[in-house]
Amino acid sequence: MAGERERGGRDRGPREERDSEFVDKLVHINRVAKVVKGGKRFGFAALVVIGDQKGRVGFGHGKAREVPEAIRKATESAKRNLTRVPLREGRTLHHDIAGRHGAGRVYLRAAPAGTGIIAGGPMRAVFETLGIQDVVAKSIGSSNPYNMVRATFDALKHQDSPRSVAARRNIKVSTLQSRRVGGDAEVVAE
């Protein structure tokens, strides 16, 4: 029991639940205050990103008087807001994309195998829980964790797999991939 905590904690590492396939990461904890007649009532707000490392990811926000309860609420909110993101070869993005939320902008670039996750702060948590292994990301503008996570999700929402592009254009995936200039022609459509 000495090395294992039963509740909460601020270790910022991945906490895997016993009976779940999801991995969750605590992105940010903020102490908030509500001003009442008798003074200030303090609480905590938590931002959590959750994913199955196979292409599903979500984020949630929770507020409570205690940190573990705020994290639990944020995790439940993230589980309700899961989205599926198509990955190329199960390790990177299909194409370069940009996203924005408020004053925060993010640019995400697909990367060759072995590059790793080159991203800062909240974006790294999203990519690790999503299952992306190779990506280069840059954030410009707001460094607020909430805006960065929402901008990253906005970018991921605009990503298209070759299969969906081919279906939209009413052509075959092989025809679409043969048109690619340079790069690898044997891209696996997911």
From Swiss-Prot:
InterPro entries: Ribosomal_Su5_D2-typ_SF, Ribosomal_uS5, Ribosomal_uS5_bac-type, Ribosomal_uS5_C, Ribosomal_uS5_N, Ribosomal_uS5_N_CS, Ribsml_uS5_D2-typ_fold_subgr. Keywords: Ribonucleoprotein, Ribosomal protein, RNA-binding, rRNA-binding. One of its GO terms (molecular function) is structural constituent of ribosome. Gene3D superfamilies: 3.30.160.20, 3.30.230.10. The keyword Ribosomal protein applies. With S4 and S12 plays an important role in translational accuracy. Located at the back of the 30S subunit body where it stabilizes the conformation of the head with respect to the body. The N-terminal domain interacts with the head of the 30S subunit; the C-terminal domain interacts with the body and contacts protein S4. The interaction surface between S4 and S5 is involved in control of translational fidelity. Part of the 30S ribosomal subunit. Contacts proteins S4 and S8. This is Small ribosomal subunit protein uS5. The gene is rpsE.
